[in-house]
């Protein structure tokens, strides 16, 4: 930190012209950062709604594949991560590879949505949206992609719904054996052990007796929490900006990523109940099944082609936490891969774009139907 401040002072006391340019850029970033944001420039149309959710459609540059690629977004984030920069956009990349792309945008959830839970998404919203997508794309089947919490959503949807219309399933950075997820996994395991010593408290927590208004978390807390979970990445990003104030591209990228991280959306209380107290604390998916209310969902019901990915440097959901999914389904076509980057970088980093996006394209190409107009 001291080194970074020293370098900054050296820059700001350098040649007058250079100094003026750097001070101007620093001022733009601090006071007019919104004007520097580059995200969500790829054109799309809305082809359907489900309550506050929207189905975005991004047409292929030249359609090569019958099955569309459907991105299901995690809750709490805005959609920028899928279309971050004009020159490095996940959505734009796959439309250029010949896929019609659809994105499930959950909209701006708020306190009034505090009762929403996993089943509202995997048993209601996602099935409805997939029916709309199948009709719009004129394809019986789809390729379904989920990252982070959305990876859990698409996994449980595919296991629960029959028929599910999923030809190819992609699950990235999603905790399957939560206790194996580094330090945070050990913490959840320890908390679960402590709770098991007091049956009354355990029942209150695990059976939904805590009011959803208490469990509901506003977007600003989610934004702070995301940064706390990766303080090194947050610090390094600011340090690189301060050391390279004359780099116009870096200035735009810092503002764009900052805009994404600073504008998170609420987590409904019911979803926090299912994610924190079920997925993370009880770790049911390690055994291949989860109980949500009166429904037991078994991963062995999944038999489609399955690609599982984990970030090489992901400290939130480690590779050891993700990989067990490889052994829990009835798919005869399972691929596990490590992706450059951490929990966010596996979706958006330059290394992921250079290495993983082409690999995913090839994987889908080998498992998709050629489109005939």
What residue ranges belong to the model's regions?
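Alpha/beta-hydrolase active-site loop
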Residues: 116-134
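Gly/Ala-rich beta-loop-alpha elbow adjacent to hydrolase catalytic centers
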Residues: 145-154
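Short alpha-helix in the alpha/beta-hydrolase fold that links the catalytic acid
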Residues: 304, 318-327
